[in-house]
Amino acid sequence: MIAIDPLKTDTMKHHRIASLLLSGLLSCGLAQSQSSREKMPRQDVVEVPALGGGLCVSNLFQTNMVVQRDKPVTIWGWAAPGEKVTVSFAGQAADAVAGPDRAWQASLAALPASTTPQVMKIQGKGATLELANILVGDVWILGGQSNMEFDLSKVNDGALEVASANFPQIRLLTLPQGKGFDSVRSFERLHEWSDWSGRHFRKGDWDVCSPETIKEFSAIGAVFGRRLFMATGVPIGLIDASIGGTTVETWTPEAVMRGIDAPETKDMLAEWDARIAAYDAQDDLRKQIANYEKQQQKRAAEGKPLPADSKPPSALRPGPVADKNRPGHCYAGVIRPLEGLAVTGAVFHQGFNNCFGGSAGARMYYQVFGRMIAAWRAAFNDPELPFCIMSLCTAGDPQTWENFLKPMYDVGPLIREAQYRTFRDLHDAGDKGIGFASTFDFRKSFYHPQIKVPAGERAAKWALATRYGLLGGKDAEAYWLPPSIKEVKIVDGTIRLTMSGNIVTKDESDGKLLGFAIAGKDRRFQPANVQWYTDGSVNDRKQPQYQRNVLVLSSPLVPEPAHYRHAWARNPLTNLVSERQVPLATQRSDDWLLEETPEKIVMPENMPADGAKRQAANQLRAELELADTERRIKEAEATIAQLKPAFEKAKAAMQEKKAAAAKKRESAAGR
């Protein structure tokens, strides 16, 4: 990393430069040309460091920001030890004194929402900082991994959202990845290099929402914020704190996880401790140099020129201690710099990178996730902070009726189940701030499904119904709350589920009710035939009367069902929703392990470890495909058996009719 504008002791000069960066640079530097990007080195380029000398304020506080309404406002920064600092804003002033560590913190009383741009002044002994164009409204945190991070310009209908994004009262901030455990209560403002994309991304600056500034912003966040602003007229500040390829444990304080007394979490922490202890930076450098020399020799042997700027590795790498998925790393580097900030709430969309740990990893997720939510609420000084869980999105080929069982063998639904269980634990205990939104029903194969606009709208429905009270009135929950299962009964070879409300098909489509699988005690699942319950009564037209809040699950291949699963695949086959089109979430009644269902019932023993595991998994999937084929054959045979008597009867009647007609013709010809 290099810094192109390091802070000097002349802090007034620095902060005037910072103010310019937040106004002039933000308006013209955002549209950085490709040629200027190419001039930058392939590494992070820092414009404003996280912490400067003399009087300075956390980079969280800038020109163009939104200050949270209706909550005390805390501002922090650094100055010379013992220096008095005065913060003035919106007719208020608060004093603070820098401590021995240079840190100071001042608090202002809660303010009402205001669309009038205002100036915040931070005055020290010999310098005054001015932050302009600040609004007072609602600040929302956007967390998770790449599906939250995914650019608005790249999603379905994103071009329209971008082109119509002239909303000067919406403000945007995308945070950098941070420094992990070395972070302070601030962050760098920089051009962040991405090896994945092969380019720089501008991070750490508050922007006024426009087509230019929003195009690379979080698609879900942009749609969410826009819908809130259009409904409320209150200024909206969106802080994108998501980082691609991250796990739930990296977003949770390490100390919180150390306090979890559960074997799966303890094992995960022990594995990380062992990796960190075993890492040898010198040995790693030797391997880097050896690989570099090998590649250079290969290029020379192939007659390819050596790059002019090619140099052998010389720097020691920090190794796993700096891995972004080290437990607590992203919390320390991204969330901790925000601690103490007043915000309205958070939306969190994550899960993909936790889909590689089998049943143990899913159990660890459940152990950690609720505590992560509590830690975020503590960070923002609000134990009831509104927090919306967006469940794991789809990936892979869609599950179909013909290919039903193989897709069930996946960690994805286990992670989704852990997310939904966490939500239910909190909601059913009376947590009024917790929210939930499914995204699996959009049914895209790409693990970055580009249907983000309706995903953002689902989160907005939750916020408008709960935080703002602008959607649904007394029936507000109906617009976002997933239907729940209130009662389960085993009746005459079926599983009967009583739901919290009526269940219909998505978009009121015709056809079968889809989405459930059932199994007996043998743990062999089959797709269930799903019907609404009827007690045999009929209406005036002799049509059966259905209770649409009661579902009956059955399968001729499961004569004694014991358990059910719903939406049990990474890209599940289901069309069951509430009357307000809220999907029925991924859930199950059993607690069987992935490694026991279907492995133990298909294979002679447990899945082997190491090199043989992939081969065994392929064998398992082939077995499941055969089981699906066997079921389809039996379904076809049953269909034939059902249709054959009527077919034979109709065929015989047709033959009799033909014979009678022929006889009649012969009789007529004889006359």
Describe each region flagged by the PLM.
Residues 1-11:
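Short, Lys/Arg-enriched N-terminal segments with co-localized hydrophobic residues
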Residues 613-671:
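Extended amphipathic alpha-helical heptad-repeat regions
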Residues 19-29:
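Bacterial N-terminal signal peptides
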Residues 34-624, 629:
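Cell-envelope and extracellular/periplasmic
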Residues 10-20:
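Bacterial N-terminal signal peptides that target proteins for export
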